[in-house]
Amino acid sequence: MSRKVVQPPSLRIIPPLNFCPVEKQLYRSGQPSIINQSFLQDLNLKTIIWLASEEPQEEFLDYCSMNSINIEFVGMINDDYSYQNVNPWDSLNETTIKKALELICDRNNYPMLVCCGMGRHRTGTVIGCLRRLQGWNLASVSEEYRRFTGARGGRILVELLIEGFDISTVEIGSGKGSSMARKKR
């Protein structure tokens, strides 16, 4: 028996721009907006890692506050070394990448979303370094990074940063999610 849908559902479930699962209960995307809130609600997020150097939109901050989601402003680290050695147009450096990876490797922060403005380059850099930590080969890491950069293409300097990142500096505590560092591809 077929049923006819007379009216579309009033609640639309729309994922954020460039949304994709990375691992179980770990997701990546661009900055969520108000139309993504129903989708995010179903993820039961505990932590969001914000990688951009600029403040997120006010509605995004309000949503996180109302839902008791912890926001880690990794792209906005203000220590003296980072301040003097960071390109003001791109907030990622060894310090911020290391901090993001240590948060990702702590399973106490899950479910987790890693995001930046568009979910391309900054998010792709951190996820690329995570893949290196997991033992992925560089061809697979680069392919995944380029999948999210679209027609603009990847940035060779980002890929070189991912390749040159010293994964041995990332501190993974016992019981915090060390399984994240063992997956190979």
Swiss-Prot record:
> What species is this protein from?
Meyerozyma guilliermondii (strain ATCC 6260 / CBS 566 / DSM 6381 / JCM 1539 / NBRC 10279 / NRRL Y-324)
Its annotated function is as follows: Putative tyrosine-protein phosphatase required for protection against superoxide stress.
Catalytic residue positions:
C116 (phosphocysteine intermediate)
Q: What EC number(s) would the UniProt record show?
A: 3.1.3.48
Q: Which reaction does it catalyse?
A: O-phospho-L-tyrosyl-[protein] + H2O = L-tyrosyl-[protein] + phosphate
PROSITE patterns xrefs: TYR_PHOSPHATASE_DUAL
Name assigned to this protein: Putative tyrosine-protein phosphatase OCA1
Q: Where does the Tyrosine-protein phosphatase domain lie?
A: 18-178
Q: Where is the signal peptide?
A: none
Molecular function GO terms recorded: protein tyrosine phosphatase activity
Q: What is its main location?
A: cytoplasm
